[in-house]
Protein backbone atom coordinates (compact mmCIF):
# COMPACT_ATOMS: atom_id res chain seq x y z
CA UNK A 1 0.00 0.00 0.00
CA UNK A 2 1.52 3.33 -1.13
CA UNK A 3 1.40 6.19 1.33
CA UNK A 4 0.66 9.63 -0.09
CA UNK A 5 3.02 12.45 0.90
CA UNK A 6 0.66 13.99 3.44
CA UNK A 7 0.23 10.68 5.28
CA UNK A 8 4.00 10.23 5.32
CA UNK A 9 4.36 13.77 6.63
CA UNK A 10 1.73 13.14 9.29
CA UNK A 11 3.49 10.01 10.52
CA UNK A 12 6.83 11.76 10.56
CA UNK A 13 5.46 14.82 12.31
CA UNK A 14 3.77 12.65 14.91
CA UNK A 15 7.05 11.06 15.92
CA UNK A 16 8.78 14.43 15.80
CA UNK A 17 6.19 16.03 18.05
CA UNK A 18 6.43 13.19 20.54
CA UNK A 19 10.16 12.64 20.73
CA UNK A 20 12.15 15.61 19.40
CA UNK A 21 10.99 18.04 22.11
CA UNK A 22 13.60 17.89 24.91
CA UNK A 23 11.00 17.88 27.67
CA UNK A 24 9.20 14.93 26.11
CA UNK A 25 12.20 12.94 24.97
CA UNK A 26 13.14 12.17 28.58
CA UNK A 27 9.73 10.69 29.46
CA UNK A 28 9.64 7.08 30.57
CA UNK A 29 7.04 6.08 33.14
CA UNK A 30 4.92 9.16 32.41
CA UNK A 31 4.10 8.26 28.81
CA UNK A 32 0.83 6.51 27.92
CA UNK A 33 -0.01 4.40 24.91
CA UNK A 34 -2.74 2.03 23.86
CA UNK A 35 -4.91 0.55 21.14
CA UNK A 36 -8.59 1.15 20.39
CA UNK A 37 -10.27 -1.77 18.65
CA UNK A 38 -13.62 -1.14 16.97
CA UNK A 39 -15.73 -3.63 15.05
CA UNK A 40 -18.65 -2.12 13.12
CA UNK A 41 -21.48 -3.86 11.32
CA UNK A 42 -23.52 -1.68 8.96
CA UNK A 43 -26.81 -2.25 7.16
CA UNK A 44 -28.22 0.44 4.86
CA UNK A 45 -31.06 0.28 2.32
CA UNK A 46 -31.16 2.52 0.46
CA UNK A 47 -29.93 6.12 0.47
CA UNK A 48 -31.10 6.66 -3.13
CA UNK A 49 -34.71 5.78 -2.21
CA UNK A 50 -34.84 3.46 -5.21
CA UNK A 51 -34.25 6.25 -7.75
CA UNK A 52 -30.96 4.85 -9.05
CA UNK A 53 -28.79 1.76 -8.77
CA UNK A 54 -26.67 1.17 -5.69
CA UNK A 55 -27.20 2.96 -2.40
CA UNK A 56 -27.04 -0.17 -0.25
CA UNK A 57 -24.36 -1.11 2.28
CA UNK A 58 -24.10 -4.41 4.13
CA UNK A 59 -20.84 -5.42 5.71
CA UNK A 60 -18.44 -5.63 8.60
CA UNK A 61 -15.42 -3.47 9.36
CA UNK A 62 -12.42 -3.68 11.71
CA UNK A 63 -10.94 -0.35 12.85
CA UNK A 64 -7.65 -0.33 14.82
CA UNK A 65 -6.49 2.96 16.36
CA UNK A 66 -3.10 2.91 18.09
CA UNK A 67 -2.35 6.01 20.15
CA UNK A 68 0.44 7.44 22.24
CA UNK A 69 0.27 10.33 24.69
CA UNK A 70 2.88 11.97 26.87
CA UNK A 71 3.30 14.99 29.08
CA UNK A 72 6.06 16.58 31.07
CA UNK A 73 5.77 19.89 32.83
CA UNK A 74 3.66 22.23 30.71
CA UNK A 75 4.22 20.23 27.51
CA UNK A 76 2.11 17.41 26.12
CA UNK A 77 1.84 15.55 22.83
CA UNK A 78 -0.53 13.06 21.29
CA UNK A 79 -0.80 10.98 18.12
CA UNK A 80 -3.41 8.50 16.92
CA UNK A 81 -3.21 6.37 13.77
CA UNK A 82 -5.86 4.25 12.13
CA UNK A 83 -6.01 1.02 10.12
CA UNK A 84 -9.35 -0.08 8.64
CA UNK A 85 -10.26 -3.32 6.88
CA UNK A 86 -13.84 -4.06 5.82
CA UNK A 87 -16.02 -6.18 3.55
CA UNK A 88 -17.78 -3.07 2.19
CA UNK A 89 -17.31 0.70 2.45
CA UNK A 90 -18.23 0.77 6.13
CA UNK A 91 -18.57 3.95 8.21
CA UNK A 92 -16.47 3.19 11.27
CA UNK A 93 -15.98 6.89 12.06
CA UNK A 94 -18.93 9.15 12.93
CA UNK A 95 -16.73 12.25 12.48
CA UNK A 96 -16.06 11.85 8.77
CA UNK A 97 -19.06 10.10 7.26
CA UNK A 98 -20.15 11.38 3.86
CA UNK A 99 -23.35 13.32 4.38
CA UNK A 100 -25.13 11.47 1.61
CA UNK A 101 -23.15 8.29 2.00
CA UNK A 102 -21.74 8.56 -1.50
CA UNK A 103 -18.28 8.82 -2.95
CA UNK A 104 -17.27 11.40 -5.50
CA UNK A 105 -17.16 10.15 -9.10
CA UNK A 106 -14.05 11.85 -10.43
CA UNK A 107 -12.83 9.49 -13.11
CA UNK A 108 -9.96 8.50 -10.83
CA UNK A 109 -9.70 7.23 -7.27
CA UNK A 110 -8.53 10.41 -5.52
CA UNK A 111 -11.86 10.78 -3.64
CA UNK A 112 -13.00 7.17 -3.85
CA UNK A 113 -13.01 5.60 -0.37
CA UNK A 114 -11.57 2.09 -0.19
CA UNK A 115 -12.77 -0.75 1.96
CA UNK A 116 -9.35 -0.78 3.64
CA UNK A 117 -7.00 2.12 4.33
CA UNK A 118 -4.42 3.61 6.69
CA UNK A 119 -4.76 7.07 8.22
CA UNK A 120 -3.43 9.53 10.77
CA UNK A 121 -6.34 10.81 12.84
CA UNK A 122 -4.52 13.20 15.16
CA UNK A 123 -1.02 14.48 15.88
CA UNK A 124 -0.46 17.53 18.02
CA UNK A 125 1.71 19.16 20.65
CA UNK A 126 0.26 21.22 23.49
CA UNK A 127 1.58 23.82 25.91
CA UNK A 128 -0.23 24.77 29.14
CA UNK A 129 2.05 27.44 30.58
CA UNK A 130 0.53 30.61 29.20
CA UNK A 131 -1.55 31.15 32.36
CA UNK A 132 -1.66 29.66 35.84
CA UNK A 133 -5.12 28.14 35.31
CA UNK A 134 -5.15 24.32 35.02
CA UNK A 135 -7.79 24.29 32.27
CA UNK A 136 -5.78 26.33 29.78
CA UNK A 137 -3.85 24.91 26.80
CA UNK A 138 -2.44 26.02 23.46
CA UNK A 139 -2.44 23.13 20.99
CA UNK A 140 -0.91 22.93 17.49
CA UNK A 141 -1.40 20.18 14.92
CA UNK A 142 -4.17 17.97 13.60
CA UNK A 143 -6.62 17.75 16.49
CA UNK A 144 -10.23 17.26 17.49
CA UNK A 145 -12.16 20.52 17.61
CA UNK A 146 -15.54 20.11 19.25
CA UNK A 147 -18.41 22.23 20.49
CA UNK A 148 -20.80 20.62 22.97
CA UNK A 149 -23.74 20.66 20.55
CA UNK A 150 -21.66 19.44 17.60
CA UNK A 151 -23.35 22.05 15.39
CA UNK A 152 -20.43 24.46 15.05
CA UNK A 153 -17.38 22.22 15.24
CA UNK A 154 -16.78 18.51 15.70
CA UNK A 155 -14.00 17.25 13.46
CA UNK A 156 -10.31 16.41 13.20
CA UNK A 157 -8.49 19.24 11.42
CA UNK A 158 -5.13 21.02 11.35
CA UNK A 159 -5.41 23.93 13.79
CA UNK A 160 -3.76 26.27 16.25
CA UNK A 161 -6.25 26.24 19.11
CA UNK A 162 -6.22 27.89 22.53
CA UNK A 163 -8.63 26.57 25.17
CA UNK A 164 -9.49 28.08 28.54
CA UNK A 165 -11.77 25.92 30.71
CA UNK A 166 -12.52 26.78 34.34
CA UNK A 167 -15.50 26.37 36.65
CA UNK A 168 -17.02 29.76 35.83
CA UNK A 169 -15.57 30.60 32.40
CA UNK A 170 -14.96 28.67 29.19
CA UNK A 171 -13.35 30.09 26.08
CA UNK A 172 -11.51 29.00 22.98
CA UNK A 173 -9.85 30.80 20.09
CA UNK A 174 -8.22 29.39 17.01
CA UNK A 175 -7.50 29.16 13.32
CA UNK A 176 -7.88 26.00 11.24
CA UNK A 177 -7.47 24.79 7.68
CA UNK A 178 -7.66 21.34 6.17
CA UNK A 179 -4.60 20.42 4.08
CA UNK A 180 -5.12 16.69 3.69
CA UNK A 181 -7.35 13.80 4.74
CA UNK A 182 -4.20 11.93 5.86
CA UNK A 183 -5.64 8.72 4.41
CA UNK A 184 -4.06 6.36 1.91
CA UNK A 185 -7.24 6.17 -0.17
CA UNK A 186 -8.26 9.85 -0.26
CA UNK A 187 -5.44 11.79 -1.89
CA UNK A 188 -7.51 14.89 -2.70
CA UNK A 189 -9.51 17.18 -0.46
CA UNK A 190 -13.22 17.63 -0.99
CA UNK A 191 -13.75 20.77 -3.12
CA UNK A 192 -15.46 22.66 -0.29
CA UNK A 193 -12.39 22.16 1.95
CA UNK A 194 -9.78 23.37 -0.54
CA UNK A 195 -8.23 26.76 0.27
CA UNK A 196 -10.74 27.38 3.06
CA UNK A 197 -9.51 28.97 6.30
CA UNK A 198 -11.55 28.97 9.53
CA UNK A 199 -11.13 31.56 12.30
CA UNK A 200 -13.27 31.07 15.39
CA UNK A 201 -13.77 32.03 19.01
CA UNK A 202 -16.23 31.24 21.82
CA UNK A 203 -16.76 32.46 25.35
CA UNK A 204 -19.32 31.26 27.92
CA UNK A 205 -19.83 32.00 31.59
CA UNK A 206 -21.72 30.21 34.35
CA UNK A 207 -23.91 33.06 35.54
CA UNK A 208 -25.56 30.92 38.23
CA UNK A 209 -24.70 27.36 39.27
CA UNK A 210 -25.44 24.97 36.42
CA UNK A 211 -26.58 27.64 33.93
CA UNK A 212 -24.42 29.03 31.11
CA UNK A 213 -24.68 31.88 28.62
CA UNK A 214 -22.23 32.49 25.82
CA UNK A 215 -21.20 34.12 22.56
CA UNK A 216 -19.86 32.28 19.51
CA UNK A 217 -18.19 33.53 16.34
CA UNK A 218 -16.83 31.77 13.27
CA UNK A 219 -15.46 33.17 10.00
CA UNK A 220 -14.48 31.30 6.85
CA UNK A 221 -12.35 32.73 4.06
CA UNK A 222 -12.39 30.77 0.81
CA UNK A 223 -9.49 31.79 -1.42
CA UNK A 224 -10.18 29.19 -4.11
CA UNK A 225 -11.11 30.09 -7.68
CA UNK A 226 -13.99 29.03 -9.90
CA UNK A 227 -13.69 27.81 -13.49
CA UNK A 228 -14.07 30.38 -16.26
CA UNK A 229 -16.99 30.22 -18.72
CA UNK A 230 -16.43 27.52 -21.32
CA UNK A 231 -14.11 25.42 -19.15
CA UNK A 232 -15.00 21.85 -18.23
CA UNK A 233 -15.93 21.31 -14.58
CA UNK A 234 -15.18 18.01 -12.89
CA UNK A 235 -16.24 16.69 -9.49
CA UNK A 236 -13.07 17.95 -7.75
CA UNK A 237 -13.46 21.56 -8.91
CA UNK A 238 -14.87 24.15 -6.56
CA UNK A 239 -18.41 25.24 -7.34
CA UNK A 240 -18.66 27.96 -4.70
CA UNK A 241 -16.45 30.42 -2.85
CA UNK A 242 -16.98 33.36 -0.53
CA UNK A 243 -16.44 34.87 2.89
CA UNK A 244 -18.98 33.98 5.58
CA UNK A 245 -19.35 35.01 9.23
CA UNK A 246 -21.48 33.31 11.88
CA UNK A 247 -22.38 35.10 15.14
CA UNK A 248 -24.31 33.25 17.81
CA UNK A 249 -25.87 33.57 21.26
CA UNK A 250 -26.48 30.51 23.43
CA UNK A 251 -27.90 29.62 26.83
CA UNK A 252 -28.16 26.20 28.44
CA UNK A 253 -28.39 24.36 31.74
CA UNK A 254 -25.28 22.28 31.05
CA UNK A 255 -27.73 20.12 29.11
CA UNK A 256 -25.07 18.32 27.06
CA UNK A 257 -23.36 17.05 30.22
CA UNK A 258 -24.97 13.63 30.70
CA UNK A 259 -23.85 13.54 34.34
CA UNK A 260 -25.88 16.56 35.44
CA UNK A 261 -28.94 15.68 37.53
CA UNK A 262 -31.15 18.74 36.96
CA UNK A 263 -34.87 18.07 36.99
CA UNK A 264 -35.28 20.37 33.98
CA UNK A 265 -32.60 20.85 31.34
CA UNK A 266 -32.78 23.29 28.46
CA UNK A 267 -30.73 24.64 25.59
CA UNK A 268 -31.31 27.51 23.22
CA UNK A 269 -29.26 29.22 20.55
CA UNK A 270 -29.73 31.72 17.76
CA UNK A 271 -27.18 32.28 15.00
CA UNK A 272 -26.86 34.97 12.33
CA UNK A 273 -25.01 34.33 9.07
CA UNK A 274 -23.73 37.14 6.90
CA UNK A 275 -21.20 37.55 4.11
CA UNK A 276 -21.03 36.87 0.39
CA UNK A 277 -21.19 33.73 -1.75
CA UNK A 278 -20.14 33.07 -5.35
CA UNK A 279 -21.73 30.04 -7.01
CA UNK A 280 -20.60 28.50 -10.29
CA UNK A 281 -23.26 28.04 -12.97
CA UNK A 282 -22.87 25.06 -15.31
CA UNK A 283 -24.71 23.28 -18.09
CA UNK A 284 -24.47 19.80 -19.57
CA UNK A 285 -22.65 19.66 -22.94
CA UNK A 286 -22.44 16.10 -24.17
CA UNK A 287 -20.90 14.10 -21.35
CA UNK A 288 -19.30 17.14 -19.68
CA UNK A 289 -20.36 19.86 -17.29
CA UNK A 290 -19.24 23.21 -18.69
CA UNK A 291 -18.99 26.47 -16.72
CA UNK A 292 -21.31 29.22 -17.94
CA UNK A 293 -20.56 31.90 -15.34
CA UNK A 294 -21.01 32.61 -11.68
CA UNK A 295 -23.78 33.97 -9.49
CA UNK A 296 -22.73 36.34 -6.72
CA UNK A 297 -24.76 37.66 -3.84
CA UNK A 298 -24.83 38.73 -0.23
CA UNK A 299 -25.97 36.34 2.48
CA UNK A 300 -28.41 37.23 5.22
CA UNK A 301 -29.61 34.13 7.07
CA UNK A 302 -30.28 32.83 10.55
CA UNK A 303 -30.86 29.62 12.51
CA UNK A 304 -32.08 28.54 15.92
CA UNK A 305 -32.01 25.37 18.01
CA UNK A 306 -34.25 25.04 21.08
CA UNK A 307 -34.77 22.11 23.42
CA UNK A 308 -36.07 21.07 26.83
CA UNK A 309 -35.57 17.82 28.75
CA UNK A 310 -37.47 16.72 31.88
CA UNK A 311 -36.08 14.17 34.32
CA UNK A 312 -38.91 11.91 35.52
CA UNK A 313 -36.73 9.92 37.92
CA UNK A 314 -33.02 9.03 38.19
CA UNK A 315 -33.30 6.73 35.15
CA UNK A 316 -35.90 8.21 32.78
CA UNK A 317 -35.98 11.51 30.86
CA UNK A 318 -38.28 12.89 28.15
CA UNK A 319 -37.86 15.94 25.98
CA UNK A 320 -38.68 17.95 22.88
CA UNK A 321 -36.62 20.10 20.52
CA UNK A 322 -37.07 22.36 17.52
CA UNK A 323 -34.49 23.62 15.03
CA UNK A 324 -34.80 25.89 12.02
CA UNK A 325 -32.29 27.09 9.45
CA UNK A 326 -33.66 29.84 7.21
CA UNK A 327 -34.22 29.42 3.48
CA UNK A 328 -35.26 31.41 0.45
CA UNK A 329 -34.03 34.65 -1.04
CA UNK A 330 -34.78 34.07 -4.71
CA UNK A 331 -32.47 32.62 -7.34
CA UNK A 332 -29.30 33.39 -5.40
CA UNK A 333 -30.59 31.75 -2.20
CA UNK A 334 -29.39 34.69 -0.13
CA UNK A 335 -31.50 33.63 2.86
CA UNK A 336 -30.33 30.01 2.85
CA UNK A 337 -28.52 29.25 6.08
CA UNK A 338 -25.55 26.89 6.05
CA UNK A 339 -23.39 25.49 8.82
CA UNK A 340 -19.65 26.04 9.22
CA UNK A 341 -18.57 22.86 7.42
CA UNK A 342 -16.83 21.52 10.55
CA UNK A 343 -19.97 20.18 12.26
CA UNK A 344 -21.01 16.60 12.99
CA UNK A 345 -24.43 17.51 14.50
CA UNK A 346 -23.85 14.81 17.13
CA UNK A 347 -24.34 15.53 20.81
CA UNK A 348 -25.69 14.21 24.12
CA UNK A 349 -28.98 16.12 23.77
CA UNK A 350 -31.06 13.12 24.94
CA UNK A 351 -29.24 13.19 28.30
CA UNK A 352 -27.26 9.95 27.95
CA UNK A 353 -23.58 9.25 27.39
CA UNK A 354 -24.27 8.17 23.78
CA UNK A 355 -23.89 10.96 21.25
CA UNK A 356 -26.84 11.02 18.83
CA UNK A 357 -27.31 12.78 15.48
CA UNK A 358 -29.45 15.86 16.03
CA UNK A 359 -31.22 15.40 12.67
CA UNK A 360 -31.61 11.65 12.44
CA UNK A 361 -29.27 8.69 12.16
CA UNK A 362 -30.74 7.99 8.71
CA UNK A 363 -31.68 11.46 7.37
CA UNK A 364 -28.58 13.25 8.76
CA UNK A 365 -29.76 16.68 7.74
CA UNK A 366 -27.79 19.90 7.71
CA UNK A 367 -29.44 22.99 9.15
CA UNK A 368 -29.99 24.80 5.85
CA UNK A 369 -33.50 25.58 4.55
CA UNK A 370 -34.61 22.98 7.08
CA UNK A 371 -36.85 22.85 10.11
CA UNK A 372 -37.04 19.85 12.40
CA UNK A 373 -39.34 18.99 15.30
CA UNK A 374 -38.11 16.29 17.68
CA UNK A 375 -39.55 14.24 20.55
CA UNK A 376 -37.43 11.83 22.56
CA UNK A 377 -37.24 9.62 25.63
CA UNK A 378 -34.07 8.30 27.24
CA UNK A 379 -33.15 5.78 29.90
CA UNK A 380 -29.91 5.29 31.82
CA UNK A 381 -29.01 2.64 34.39
CA UNK A 382 -25.99 3.73 36.44
CA UNK A 383 -22.91 3.66 34.19
CA UNK A 384 -23.87 0.29 32.68
CA UNK A 385 -26.65 0.95 30.13
CA UNK A 386 -28.32 3.78 28.27
CA UNK A 387 -30.96 4.00 25.56
CA UNK A 388 -32.66 6.74 23.53
CA UNK A 389 -35.79 6.65 21.37
CA UNK A 390 -36.17 9.68 19.09
CA UNK A 391 -38.85 10.85 16.63
CA UNK A 392 -38.13 13.56 14.02
CA UNK A 393 -40.34 15.42 11.56
CA UNK A 394 -38.60 17.40 8.77
CA UNK A 395 -39.78 20.20 6.45
CA UNK A 396 -38.24 22.62 4.00
CA UNK A 397 -38.55 26.27 4.99
CA UNK A 398 -38.74 27.37 1.33
CA UNK A 399 -40.33 24.81 -0.97
CA UNK A 400 -38.45 26.14 -4.02
CA UNK A 401 -34.91 25.94 -2.60
CA UNK A 402 -32.79 22.85 -2.01
CA UNK A 403 -31.84 21.87 1.52
CA UNK A 404 -28.28 21.55 2.76
CA UNK A 405 -26.52 18.20 2.61
CA UNK A 406 -28.25 15.13 4.03
CA UNK A 407 -27.94 11.36 4.19
CA UNK A 408 -30.42 10.96 1.30
CA UNK A 409 -29.13 10.94 -2.28
CA UNK A 410 -32.29 10.62 -4.37
CA UNK A 411 -32.99 12.04 -7.83
CA UNK A 412 -36.71 12.55 -8.39
CA UNK A 413 -38.67 13.08 -11.60
CA UNK A 414 -40.52 16.39 -11.27
CA UNK A 415 -42.68 16.70 -14.41
CA UNK A 416 -39.88 15.39 -16.61
CA UNK A 417 -37.09 17.31 -14.84
CA UNK A 418 -34.60 15.49 -12.62
CA UNK A 419 -34.26 17.27 -9.29
CA UNK A 420 -33.15 16.54 -5.73
CA UNK A 421 -36.64 17.48 -4.49
CA UNK A 422 -40.06 18.15 -6.02
CA UNK A 423 -40.46 21.88 -6.58
CA UNK A 424 -42.94 23.50 -4.20
CA UNK A 425 -43.26 20.56 -1.79
CA UNK A 426 -42.05 21.20 1.77
CA UNK A 427 -42.69 17.87 3.53
CA UNK A 428 -39.33 16.05 3.68
CA UNK A 429 -40.46 13.15 5.84
CA UNK A 430 -40.17 11.68 9.31
CA UNK A 431 -37.86 9.33 11.16
CA UNK A 432 -37.61 7.06 14.19
CA UNK A 433 -34.20 6.43 15.79
CA UNK A 434 -33.06 4.09 18.52
CA UNK A 435 -29.64 4.14 20.19
CA UNK A 436 -28.84 1.51 22.84
CA UNK A 437 -25.49 1.01 24.58
CA UNK A 438 -24.07 -1.49 27.06
CA UNK A 439 -20.88 -0.37 28.85
CA UNK A 440 -18.59 -3.03 30.24
CA UNK A 441 -15.69 -1.29 31.94
CA UNK A 442 -14.57 2.17 32.92
CA UNK A 443 -11.37 3.29 31.24
CA UNK A 444 -8.25 4.53 32.97
CA UNK A 445 -7.25 7.23 30.50
CA UNK A 446 -5.48 10.57 31.06
CA UNK A 447 -7.96 13.34 31.85
CA UNK A 448 -6.34 15.57 29.22
CA UNK A 449 -7.39 13.11 26.51
CA UNK A 450 -11.11 13.54 27.18
CA UNK A 451 -11.72 15.33 23.87
CA UNK A 452 -9.92 12.71 21.81
CA UNK A 453 -11.55 9.69 23.47
CA UNK A 454 -15.21 10.04 24.52
CA UNK A 455 -16.11 6.62 25.82
CA UNK A 456 -15.22 4.19 28.60
CA UNK A 457 -12.94 1.32 27.70
CA UNK A 458 -15.50 -1.20 26.38
CA UNK A 459 -19.00 -1.03 24.97
CA UNK A 460 -21.52 -2.47 22.52
CA UNK A 461 -23.82 0.05 20.80
CA UNK A 462 -26.73 -0.11 18.36
CA UNK A 463 -27.47 3.02 16.30
CA UNK A 464 -30.42 2.71 13.95
CA UNK A 465 -32.79 5.01 12.08
CA UNK A 466 -35.75 4.41 9.77
CA UNK A 467 -36.69 7.32 7.47
CA UNK A 468 -40.06 7.67 5.71
CA UNK A 469 -39.80 10.15 2.80
CA UNK A 470 -42.36 12.92 2.45
CA UNK A 471 -43.99 14.54 -0.58
CA UNK A 472 -40.83 16.50 -1.42
CA UNK A 473 -39.22 13.24 -2.60
CA UNK A 474 -42.08 12.43 -4.97
CA UNK A 475 -44.37 9.45 -5.27
CA UNK A 476 -42.01 7.05 -7.08
CA UNK A 477 -39.46 6.70 -4.29
CA UNK A 478 -39.21 3.86 -1.80
CA UNK A 479 -41.57 4.04 1.15
CA UNK A 480 -38.76 3.67 3.71
CA UNK A 481 -35.00 3.67 4.04
CA UNK A 482 -32.91 2.54 7.00
CA UNK A 483 -29.38 2.96 8.27
CA UNK A 484 -28.20 0.81 11.20
CA UNK A 485 -24.87 0.18 12.92
CA UNK A 486 -23.66 -2.15 15.63
CA UNK A 487 -20.37 -1.03 17.20
CA UNK A 488 -18.19 -3.13 19.49
CA UNK A 489 -15.37 -1.10 21.05
CA UNK A 490 -12.57 -2.23 23.32
CA UNK A 491 -9.73 0.00 24.50
CA UNK A 492 -6.46 -1.58 25.61
From Swiss-Prot:
Provide the protein name: Alginate production protein AlgE
Give the species: Pseudomonas putida (strain ATCC 47054 / DSM 6125 / CFBP 8728 / NCIMB 11950 / KT2440)
Principal localization? Answer: membrane
Organism domain of life: Bacteria
A single Gene Ontology CC term: cell outer membrane
A Pfam family name for this chain? Alginate_exp
Give the source lineage, highest ranks first. Answer: Bacteria, Pseudomonadati, Pseudomonadota, Gammaproteobacteria, Pseudomonadales
Compartment list: Cell outer membrane
Span of the signal peptide: 1-25
Per the entry, what this protein does is: Has non-porin-like, channel-forming properties and probably functions as an alginate permeability pore.
